[in-house]
Amino acid sequence: MKDKVYKCGYKQCKLGGKVNKDIAVKKGNRYYHSECLQEIYNKEQIRELFLKHINPTEIISLLNRTINQIIDVKKVSSEFLLYALEYVIKNKLPLNRAAGLYYIINNKHIKNDYMKQKAKEIDNKIRNKNVQSNNEVKFNLFIQDNTWNRIIER
């Protein structure tokens, strides 16, 4: 029996546009790849952060066009753009317009900080896997008598 195949609901799907039922994520009446749905959430969060912290009077269509241009045409990951915007807000760097997003994605300090953060996340994942794989508990019991000889040996 064939698996049911749905069309991914994300217009800019980078994974071929078709998603199998076993890996599909449903939101509303549409089915998405998990990566596509994460990108949609990231874009929404970028939009909200920009309008809340940077410029609430920015034209929405211009902001959307800029975000789509950066993510879809320039092939910058939505995670990096979200991180860069959070970095600008946290460090109070100057950013007034949506066109300024082009400049923050090329900032060397932001790129280096992002790479360090990603390296830490990967390191933590590796450590967690190693901890989970070593579930065997080794317990050794050494019975020692409490005598003056033991105190003198130390």
Region spans (language model):
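Long, charged low-complexity interaction segments
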Residues: 25-76, 133-154
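Short, cationic/aromatic linear interface patches
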Residues: 79-135
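Short, well-structured alpha-helical interface segments that form or flank functional binding sites
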Residues: 3, 65, 99
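Short cysteine-rich clusters marking metal-coordination/redox-active sites
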Residues: 5-13, 33-36
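Canonical RING-type zinc finger of E3 ubiquitin-protein ligases
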Residues: 17-26
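Residue-level marker of positions within ordered structural domains that often coincide
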Residues: 13, 38-41, 106-109
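Intrinsically disordered, low-complexity coil segments
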Residues: 15-18, 58
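Short metal-coordination and nucleic-acid-contact micro-motifs, chiefly zinc-binding Cys/His arrays
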Residues: 1-9, 26-29
